[in-house]
Amino acid sequence: MKFVDEATLIVQSGDGGRGCVSFRRERFIPRGGPDGGNGGKGGDVVLVATRAKHTLYHFRYKHRFQAQRGGYGSGANRHGKNGEDLLIEVPVGTIVRDAETSEIIADLSVEEERCIVCHGGRGGKGNKHFTSSTYRAPRFAQDGEEGEEKTLKLELKLLADVGLVGLPNAGKSSLITALTAARPKIGAYPFTTLAPSLGVLQDPYGEPVVIADIPGLIEGAAQGAGLGHRFLRHIERNRLLIHLIDASQVTAEDPLASYQAINKELSSYDQALGEKPQIVVLNKMDLPEAEEGACLFKQSCGNLQVLQISAILGEGLDELIEAIFAQLREPGRRPS
């Protein structure tokens, strides 16, 4: 299924039902009073967060939704049936904005969390409601209130514990495949991954760890280059970043070039991203040039802790997994 992380919806709640004009008609009561019931309330439009969906793809072709209107009132003081609420499922991690003002209406970050985005119209009053000591036979009733209509902008931010970041072709897809059961597209050319993918790493002593493979960032991503804004926003909720570097591409002229480029983009987008804890990992240690590149990087990075792995061969992964669990178990690293 194609990953879609933005969608625009037009939603409308149900109109209230019309009140009824009716008079009591029974044997031996020739002049029964008014008995018109009220109309029913229109249905609300409710967004519901669910982990059963991981993308906004289901809104690609259907983007207009309307809740049920309220039923009409009837005689014998019978009220109209309330319209059913319309429940629209969205993935956990969806931010709901008013498309016209960009104001955030809701941040649905918890399973089964709900938000009423449009309230149904109130039902109209039947003619019985308008009787008085001086007006005993009103021959009119009230129309139901119109429902609300809104245009919503949905933005999905993945809820993952760990985010994999790095330049294109650093080996992020190979790493998430090696660590989890995820199966993203893998290739020996930049931008193989065009959308985030998720995998789950089982912690034998704690909760499962969700890892997100974030598509490769490029210079200018913080300003939107290469769909940078859409990729970077998925990192905002990560508790830990794995900063992956292709060791075979480290050069003597500027050993820290790729490392500094990614950190610059993170900080430019949001200072908080640049301050997130990172595990720096040199990948592709199976390639001939990687050993020299790793030495150059370590000589230039000072006291920075660096791990070396080969995602393709599975080398060094046990140490990386231990480092991930150790970081996430630290106080204050649990999700709020």
Swiss-Prot record:
Gene Ontology CC annotations of this record: cytoplasm
**Obg domain spans which residues?**
1-159
Molecular function (GO) terms for this protein are: GTP binding; GTPase activity; magnesium ion binding
Carries keyword Hydrolase?
yes
The organism sits in which domain of life?
A: Bacteria
Positions binding Mg(2+) in this chain are 173, 193
Summarize where GTP binds, as residue positions.
Answer: 166-173, 191-195, 213-216, 283-286, 310-312
Cofactor section = Mg(2+)
Q: Which residues form the signal peptide?
A: none
PROSITE patterns, sorted: G_OBG, GTP1_OBG, OBG
The GO annotation for biological process reads: ribosome biogenesis
Q: Which UniProt keywords apply?
A: Cytoplasm, GTP-binding, Hydrolase, Magnesium, Metal-binding, Nucleotide-binding
Q: What is its EC number?
A: 3.6.5.-
Give a short account of what the protein does: An essential GTPase which binds GTP, GDP and possibly (p)ppGpp with moderate affinity, with high nucleotide exchange rates and a fairly low GTP hydrolysis rate. Plays a role in control of the cell cycle, stress response, ribosome biogenesis and in those bacteria that undergo differentiation, in morphogenesis control.
NCBIfam families (alphabetical):
Obg_CgtA, PRK12296.1, PRK12297.1, PRK12299.1
Record-given protein name? GTPase Obg
Name the encoding gene, please.
obg
